[in-house]
Amino acid sequence: MQPMKKILIFAVLALVSLQAAAQVEYKASRFGIKSNGLIDNTTSIQKAVDWIAEQGGGTLVFNVGRYLTGSIQLRSGVNIRLNEGAVIVGAANIYAYKGQKGIFWGEGLENVTIFGKGVIDGQGPALKAFIAEQQKKGYVAADVPVPAILSFKDCKGIVLRTFIFRNPATPSLFVAENSEVVEDGCYTDTPL
């Protein structure tokens, strides 16, 4: 009976430890991510997402501020929390997206949640104007893909909860090709 009790206690402790690890939160500022809306945070945010994934998952927390970024590849088990007053601002420069279909994107992801009372602003009008200017100069193809705010392909367990979509560059707020995406309470304050 004693060995069985020890195994049961060990199993419970292991489960609690795994749950605690999955719920670890990391402030964006810890990774040098700037909230002034002027600095391009693409590299810093990507490094933060990658590092959190390497640690076994957790939540990257954005507090009050404006966080300018290009395209960010999400990782399984890494969540994004946008606190009230936090605004992720998509770059108004098509080159910042490196051909990707969204500000936040992923392929083959599992268990990712983007949530909070913050905003993801696609800067759609400015991005479309930049693309038109680059096309006029012959720098960008006429059929260049315009990024949505979010893009998922072949993903499972994606949850989008309570944040605001603003100024999308495309009619689709998010793209979900062959993906399981649950949208719960998100809304847009921008007419599509």
Question: What does each model-identified segment do?
Answer:
Residues M1-I7:
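Positively charged n-region of N-terminal signal peptides that target proteins for export
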Residues I7-L8, L68:
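Small/flexible residues
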Residues I9-F10, A20:
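Cleavable N-terminal signal peptides
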Residues A21-L192:
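Extracellular/periplasmic carbohydrate-active domains that bind, remodel
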Residues L13-A14:
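Short, linear, compositionally biased motifs with a strong N-terminal bias
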